């Protein structure tokens, strides 16, 4: 039976740890120049409604590393953009390829596609979640701290899709998530509810200083997501005081790790001094998209579960 990765909640704690372990092994093999064609003869469809740098490159290069082939499809250039149903598209693509990723505006598009696809489907970003990003983040944190359990991660800024996935990942990882966000920009209540009902530790503050207190890592993201350009000025005003600068970083634990899933709007949500500092894990985090996603692809496309 096929397994999809639409939400971070699709993984058990054991599966979560297994993917991180495999990702670390694949990373070592890549650095050592050891071939690992675990997906030889496999083709991945990459369906994009939203533009991307890291997502497209990491999946494309990842499939090449694994001996497979990645087929890029801009949704507007397919029959999806001309009115063909998601269900019919999923049925047809399932006859051509061995797996699919989707980067889309609406989470419902991915769940609908997965419902009718007979191949594994991976959420490469939706308005509700970004689970692949959180796996890369978890690999980065594990490399830095050794274990995830007991870490305090402070999220500063908009309670967006990445924040939702991070909150729900507290269940599998044992990480404590502290969110500092202005009122009206809180994460999805359903994500918070899920975490708290399943043993996760999550606290929401409207004060960034309280959120970062004793944090092992501080995570931020752009305040203005794609499609929100019309409310940019409003959000810039609302997020005054939530910039990750040196003063806020100094309120966290000593040598706290700085995370940002990129692209960064320097001078808005984060300063040059912080993102380029010795405490920045941002570039390792970006690289780890490649390794974490390769592990996800292997596990799903070889029926590893």
UniProtKB/Swiss-Prot annotation:
GO terms, molecular function: amino acid binding; ornithine carbamoyltransferase activity
Main localisation: cytoplasm
Record-listed E.C. numbers: 2.1.3.3
InterPro entries xrefs: Asp/Orn_carbamoyltranf_P-bd, Asp/Orn_carbamoylTrfase, Asp/Orn_carbamoylTrfase_sf, Asp_carbamoyltransf_Asp/Orn-bd, Orn/put_carbamltrans, OTCase_ArgI
Positions of L-ornithine binding: 161, 221, 225-226
Compartment list: Cytoplasm
UniProt-annotated binding residues for carbamoyl phosphate: 52-55, 79, 103, 130-133, 261-262, 289
Keywords in alphabetical order: Amino-acid biosynthesis, Arginine biosynthesis, Cytoplasm, Transferase
GO cellular component, one term: cytoplasm
PROSITE patterns per the UniProt record, alphabetical: CARBAMOYLTRANSFERASE (PS00097)
Family: Belongs to the aspartate/ornithine carbamoyltransferase superfamily. OTCase family.
Biological role stated in the UniProt entry: Reversibly catalyzes the transfer of the carbamoyl group from carbamoyl phosphate (CP) to the N(epsilon) atom of ornithine (ORN) to produce L-citrulline.
Name of this protein: Ornithine carbamoyltransferase
Species the sequence originates in: Methanocorpusculum labreanum (strain ATCC 43576 / DSM 4855 / Z)
Gene label: argF
């Amino acid at each position: 039976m096929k397994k999809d990765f639409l939400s971070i909640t699709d993984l058990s704690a054991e599966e979560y740890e297994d993917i991180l372990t495999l990702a670390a092994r694949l990373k070592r093999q890549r650095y050592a120049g050891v071939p690992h064609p675990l997906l030889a003869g496999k083709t991945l469809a990459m369906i994009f409604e939203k533009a991307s740098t890291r997502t497209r490159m990491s999946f494309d290069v990842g499939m090449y590393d694994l001996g497979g082939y990645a087929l890029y499809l801009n949704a507007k250039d397919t029959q999806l953009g001309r009115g063909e149903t998601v269900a019919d598209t999923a049925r047809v693509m399932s006859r051509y390829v061995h797996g699919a990723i989707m980067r889309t505006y609406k989470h419902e598009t991915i769940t609908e596609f997965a419902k009718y696809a007979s191949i594994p489907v991976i959420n490469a970003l939706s308005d509700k979640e970004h689970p692949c990003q959180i796996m890369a983040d978890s690999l980065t944190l594990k490399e830095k701290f050794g274990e995830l359990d007991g870490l305090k991660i402070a999220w500063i800024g908009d309670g967006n899709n990445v924040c939702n996935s991070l909150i729900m990942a507290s269940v599998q990882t044992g990480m404590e998530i502290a969110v500092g966000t202005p009122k009206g920009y809180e994460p999805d209540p359903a994500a918070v509810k899920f975490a708290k009902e399943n043993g996760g530790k999550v606290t929401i503050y409207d004060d960034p200083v309280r959120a970062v207190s004793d944090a092992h890592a501080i995570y931020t993201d752009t305040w203005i997501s794609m499609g929100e350009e019309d409310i940019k000025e409003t959000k810039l005003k609302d997020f005054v005081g939530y910039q990750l600068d040196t003063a806020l970083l100094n309120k966290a634990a000593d040598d706290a790790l700085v995370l940002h899933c990129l692209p960064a709007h320097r001078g808005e949500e984060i300063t040059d001094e912080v993102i380029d500092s010795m405490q920045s894990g941002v570039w390792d985090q970006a690289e780890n998209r490649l390794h974490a996603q390769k592990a996800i692809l292997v596990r799903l496309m070889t029926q590893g579960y």
